[in-house]
């Protein structure tokens, strides 16, 4: 028995340890439940979070604004982000980086890079020799890639979200323009990795806007399709999207609302920035004309002046949207010369006339890609700040054919709210109402490969083949499997973009390389040698276009198949018994279970193998070209049966005949016969058919990225370390600034306090002069040498000053606390004395307190009175400039000791049951006669009437003034049910008038 107990103890300890670990994991998980979204615009970003108790909230930045500039200022020893960096754009435009997202995923010879150079000539861009991309050259020792700069912005957005949520956040959904190609999307993902963010999804900003619109109007969505057009003009680009809303049936959640992207059109350079650049150029021209006769320099050659003009152009664009004209003015634009000029809305519209002509373009592209007409569009909704320009709305009304444009959506925050809803849906920590999102592929992707064919006997040639992998406007996320049937040796194939004819010539040049990846397969021939007796079912390449729209090749496999016959095996007694019992209840052994003993692999493929074995080679080859042997593994076909009839490789005819034979021979499944008798084992063995066995061999893959090489892992790690060092430096800078501000604030506050009466009363002139001199010396040091002081030095200076002023502050603080503490002590002493007096008046037969308890309380009361009077007398003798002997902490200690004794007696009275009353012979309680003498009732009668009422006031709570809970919570009153007080009254032998609630 003892040994058993000893064995159980370690198990119990292990169980408790596991429970503790699980609880710790749950607590840690609860601290990281929040998710965030980043609506990454060209000019500014919006950040939103979802955390337990906070559903979908826009994050306020440090300046309490709902949107933050996407701006970074980089210097040798400091870095600024957000609004701080936007303010530095005027002082140091060369080190202030903006609109750098336009350079993501683009090589140095891209037209978009040349456009960026012309817009912002103050930035120096050099070429990365390995990737042929551009980098910002801040100084000879300082350079950053666009991905690194974006990583800084994403890290800053996470810090804002964490400060707002008050907990760490790692999971995020980031919006990207719908026209981003594979290289641009991978660049954003690399930037997120540098920032340490786990990207749940890259969601297109038009899809996020459509999701936000649908989530808040899900009650209006029904089975009837509603086509909505969203026209989103941002700072850098314009996107027009046609979305269809309707309810659909899902396997997991039943009928749910769905949005489907039907058509997309875009213009990469049409936006508010281009309008501001036109205005900036106009203002620069006006300024040069005003100084034409002064032989001044061209304002365009001054980066700081051009930065001021761009900021004023941004303000002008906003003001002219609501006013017919406005006065542009800048103080000290250049060479201390002020600039002032009047600009009208008509002039602004003339400057941007060619831009307004491009407004209908995305609408036509969206309609063409959706294969819809304007009559099918129910509503056109405006999104984005530049759509507030009146001319944009005027020009847009004509091509959309509507009387008015919809403005019933938050144009600035819709994408952020839709993205954070998707983040909550993708996170395992939240359960949201399902909303099906079907995004669309903008750029088609295909597979190209070359194969030898024999056109004539003895004449062989190479034939180029193309297979569309993901078609234009096809839904994603989606998985596809393509099968190569005519290869038995290693070969290569290429993944490229499909037909991009819908793009204009300029867009094609900006698009970049149309070749994505070259795939080299290794090990195909070895797989055929490994399974010489198996029939090849082709080389299957598994592709995945994930939720972020990023294409990946999951794996490549060589698949073989053969027919095998299971040898009859003698069943054990238990197996026979189990089969017999299951057959009696209509069950049987599943053929799936019989096949589990092999290495067969079940595939999720939609299309059967191409051609049968009886087909001639030419016919099978033609069929391969026509049918494009592609298999979608995202969902099985609805007609595909489950169970044995769904074995891979069967043709529809084989499945039908198989079902028929099984229907005619039910005993093959182990089912009971007509009379309920299970079949004989020998008969079952004879009727057992041959089954197909599939073998899968993994094929080696070597990828060569052609559009834009990804960062090597070592360079990526170097970039991560570079950003971490910058973040650490920023934290150290913030800590130093905090220490300097604390020191400066302490100096000013203390200098002011030295002249306040309450501080002068408790200090001598010499003490104040000493403190004042030290404060002045430290202030001078802070002004002269404080800029180069470290955080430790600043903290040491502050600690030195606090130590010097500690006695002064202590005396003032104690005198502030005395009135409140002494008043509380007096109240507690008075209540305790009254309580003790009432307790002593309780009759002996009803007494619940012992003499020791009451004596102890009386001693504590007397000691406290004595200590208080003595300490006050001693304190009165001391001068105010000396350390006081009456301390607030001592008063609190005395109060705690006295309150502890009173609470002990109160709790005892509350939980003590009343003693039973003695009964006479008639069964009634004995009560003393009303006219009994005082000598007969000396020990039982409560003396004078006034004391009796006082005791009742202490022992019985006021029913009118306090409820039961209030009486119980009062530390100086008994909160019992009142039985003791009633019994004391009966023992007293005095008749009292009954109260209303006792009648």
Curated annotation (Swiss-Prot):
Molecular function terms from GO: adenyl-nucleotide exchange factor activity; ATP binding; ATP-dependent protein folding chaperone
Record SUPFAM superfamilies: Actin-like ATPase domain, Heat shock protein 70kD (HSP70), C-terminal subdomain
Tissues with expression: Selectively expressed by cultured astrocytes but not endothelial cells, microglia or neurons.
Residues glycosylated per entry: 155, 222, 515, 596, 830, 862, 869, 922, 931
Signal peptide, first to last residue: 1-32
Compositionally biased residues, Polar residues: 574-583
UniProt keyword Signal, yes or no: yes
InterPro entries xrefs: ATPase_NBD, Heat_shock_70_CS, HSP70_C_sf, HSP70_peptide-bd_sf, Hsp_70_fam
Phosphoserine modification, residue list: 567
Modified residues (N6-acetyllysine): 883
Biased composition (Basic and acidic residues): 611-626, 641-668, 949-962
Localization per record: Endoplasmic reticulum lumen
Span(s) of short sequence motif Prevents secretion from ER: 996-999
Example GO BP: response to endoplasmic reticulum stress
GO cellular component: endoplasmic reticulum; endoplasmic reticulum chaperone complex; endoplasmic reticulum lumen; mitochondrion; smooth endoplasmic reticulum
Region (Disordered) location: 564-694, 909-999
Keywords noted in UniProt: Acetylation, ATP-binding, Chaperone, Endoplasmic reticulum, Glycoprotein, Nucleotide-binding, Phosphoprotein, Signal
Protein's UniProt keywords contain Metal-binding: no
Upregulating conditions: By oxygen deprivation.
Protein function: Has a pivotal role in cytoprotective cellular mechanisms triggered by oxygen deprivation. Promotes HSPA5/BiP-mediated ATP nucleotide exchange and thereby activates the unfolded protein response (UPR) pathway in the presence of endoplasmic reticulum stress. May play a role as a molecular chaperone and participate in protein folding.
Assembly mode: Part of a large chaperone multiprotein complex comprising DNAJB11, HSP90B1, HSPA5, HYOU, PDIA2, PDIA4, PDIA6, PPIB, SDF2L1, UGGT1 and very small amounts of ERP29, but not, or at very low levels, CALR nor CANX.
Family per record: Belongs to the heat shock protein 70 family.
The name this protein goes by in its record: Hypoxia up-regulated protein 1
Organism name: Rattus norvegicus (Rat)
Lineage of the species this protein comes from: Eukaryota, Metazoa, Chordata, Craniata, Vertebrata
